[in-house]
């Protein structure tokens, strides 16, 4: 339902539209992308006025080279001040419906496009590719959405011009609303234009849909719009009776209404220059066509001005001319294009809202991810730095140890060098000191060599004398060996005699022991014999009379019996005593004989012992004499050697002190 109010046209344009281009040109679909409000707020309402100049203005604090400032993606639009005393036009949003996504587009594409288009005011950042289309269009700065609303089929009948414009009046701009009033004049022109537009509409729509799949108009559409003739209407402005009031028509230089519609959010619009130029060109073209068809006295019917009522068509007007039909067909095509553009705007709104949400979420997620990445990289860098620091500390410690060890080695080498230098100095000093001593020693060696040659000659003579003395010593040794042999024989004989005497002494001791035993036994036998004599004397007494009948007599008779038995045994004891006495006498005689023999042997052994002792004394005397003779021979040999040396020295004519040199002194001076 479109409610049209009368709006006075201001003589001076608003400040916001002062910088708008005065010569509108047909723009592409991509130039019609407008700034969208943030999703989740009130329902967006379209503002069909001239766009403000701040479309690509850089917002303060929005993406200043980084992601530190987190500001809202779509800042609040300040409301515009309403002009007092003006009426407004309400446009029904019939075409603002949910458009399904294109099959060729990805689910994430609208969100990416919305997030990117929300920041068209500043330099857009590089988005991370999430779909195939974004990867293909990464080289482009501006990512254009491709989600379009499909074109609705048009009826095949020939409705009237108000019925044709009724369901589409909500998606048209203010200038197009005025065209609706202008085409409500003659019935023949509206019916013929409706039939011609209905016949040509499918072909035009299909051609436009096939020629503009990427959001831009085709070359043929641009040529057709740019080649339209410019007509100027010279009559009065037609007015249309409507329930909302009176709407004046527009001249060729005015185009669309500059005032904002009621219910549309005031403030600077976010649409670009292409969209404003397209709306202006459409409005001016509609004004020209309306002026050429109707003239100064045309009036629109109340049913066609409302646009929303399905009233029966008025009586057929007279048939218009060919030029009017052509203008009607073109006007119908333009309305279809505007409706499709409105659908595209709605789809752009939805896609941009999704892209805005995605980009906002990604913008909020980017600092966190960047912070996490930076923290991880910082942690890794810290770990690497710590490992490198530990490695450097270990290397520094090793180098310090090596340096300390090298310093110790260097100090030790310096000490060794000093010691070697001192030793070299000592050796040089000793060499300088030993030089003259070496010369003296060489002279002394020469002198000693002469003395040695002389001594060698004397030694030869002494050796000859020693050979002679040696032969004498050999003869003496032979005599000594013979004397030793005789001495050994005599010693053997003396040793045999000593052994025999020792054996005799042992036998003598054994005999003396046996004699002592016999004496003890004889003493014992004497005592026993005395005892037996005493018993025998007791037995010689008269026998006791026989016992009486008294019991005491019986006891005495027993004792008498014992005495009689003992008297019988006494005779046998006497015989045994006599025999023992005889044996004792024999033993005494044999002991005397053995004593005599032992005494004779002892005397003989004593004589032999004395003889051996005399022989040993004589042998010792001979040894002593031989030792004395050897000493005398040695003294004589030494005396002869001294005399020989003195004689040789006298022959050589040496000093008198020369004979004092002896062998011991020569050996003492040996080098």
From Swiss-Prot:
Region feature Sufficient for interaction with CTNNB1, mapped onto this chain: 449-671
Record GO biological process: fibroblast proliferation; kidney development; microtubule severing; mitotic cytokinesis; negative regulation of canonical Wnt signaling pathway; negative regulation of fibroblast proliferation; negative regulation of protein localization to nucleus; negative regulation of Wnt signaling pathway
Superkingdom of origin: Eukaryota
Stretches for region Required for centrosomal localization: 1-333
PTM annotation (Phosphoserine): residues: 249, 296, 572
Biased composition (Pro residues): 311-321
Recorded coiled-coil stretches: 329-651
Composition bias type Gly residues, residue spans: 284-295
Bias (Polar residues) ranges: 213-241
Protein name in UniProt: Leucine zipper putative tumor suppressor 2
Organism the protein comes from: Mus musculus
Lineage: Eukaryota, Metazoa, Chordata, Craniata, Vertebrata
Gene: Lzts2
